[in-house]
Amino acid sequence: KDFVIFHPSAQYNYKIYPQHSRHELLVHLSDLDIGVVITGSNNQIDTAIKNKLPALSNVFDLIGETTLEEYFALSELSLAYIGMDTLNMHIAAAQNKRIFAIFGPTNLRMWSPWSNQLQKSATEDMPIQNYGNITIFQANIPCVACGNAGCDNEHGKSECLDHISPQMVFNEVKNWYTNVRL
């Protein structure tokens, strides 16, 4: 069965989509006729996310279950990457996967995924940015992209992630998947 990867974590808490938004997005994704494989490592951040995942149909939790090599293979087999600004996003970009990336305070011009198709990365900060096979979501508030490690610049919460609607992310994924199935 076809599947997408949902990678809800990142190395730092200030880059992680809030739990309520993550859950809402997963509920929407589980309603699509496609498998959703949740990935992550076995570190403290990912384990905390794993312990709070909702039980949903079509959703398969592999957090802490794959090596990096196995993740590369899993990513290669997937149709798309949905998730945070992290190494896994860049792996998917290198594999020419369809990407739906959620960014917090990170500077897109420096850290956005590379589109092999267009031979470029993001060139400006925008709430929704499409280029090649990549869609990036980032809040439309004055402080974005501050580049700080959270609003306190000490690895705390990034309020900008609360401004990215799970419904908006889902709508982009649904539109893409509807066209893939045609």
Regions found by a protein language model. Name each.
Residues 13-16, 146:
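A generic structural signal for short coil/turn motifs at secondary-structure boundaries
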Residues 10, 19-109, 115:
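Donor-binding and catalytic core of enzymes assembling or modifying cell-surface/extracellular glycoconjugates
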Residues 16-19, 159:
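Short, solvent-exposed loop/turn segments at secondary-structure boundaries
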Residues 61-62, 93-182:
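Nucleotide-sugar donor-binding patch of glycosyltransferase catalytic domains
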Residues 1-4:
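Nucleotide-sugar donor-binding and catalytic loop/hinge architecture
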Residues 10-13, 152-153:
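A short, flexible beta-alpha/helix-coil linker loop
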